[in-house]
């Protein structure tokens, strides 16, 4: 049998402690632990518990930067239609409360960064939906031009606080599930090409307001769908369905590398919360590791790609709203393994 040196051209290193940043495939002998160790990479993603948000709520809007150590979360709602206006900022370790929204609301769309964010539409509690839009400058919220169509639970918030896209959504009263899409240029909203399928509470991701993906959601019959569409800046095209039809899911990433997680799936007599996580590679959806706590209405968050990082903030379980936060690390994360002779 060939030796390690014959294969790799060098002896195994002897180190007193594990290297700080080992390269995948690197092998060493840890003289303190008296074991041989090696560096590999994870083959599946994983969710880990992070610091809980200060205010328990569901249906929070967010603005997320990559990595997910820079997050702004705002608004939200609790059972009974009670809406929230609180704004909180996450630095990767703790949540800090900042200035409230001028108009408390839940199920609004976010977008932008933690210093330049957008809060679009939402649910006010009875009587229903709003078209009010607010812009965040890092310290306070200011009202800007309203949406053309008041709504909540829109897929979107794709882009910045000066170039944004929202798609679909729900308005009440009367109850209407929308296909309309609106685009923000920093001054006003313009209606652009409609979705092929009306929907609300869908997942959305994208690099900019001209390159987006809308996944699953609820249809006019108020059941979860699996349909997915992509946006090229002009029109929507249907692509491969997700594996688990659902509504109230969250998402992150880009048009060609997307993560979706959580939501509600059909059940009897009521829908059931799910922790199902799926990854889009530009061609197909693959199931990955579930959330630790199944939920819907968890504020979304994603890194630059779905295989890097994402965050699930608060949300609603079958037992009620929660403050729990989970962070996602995708496949390919560094992993140190200990070799044994067994």
What residue ranges belong to the model's regions?
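Polar, enzyme-active/binding microenvironments
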Residues: 1-342
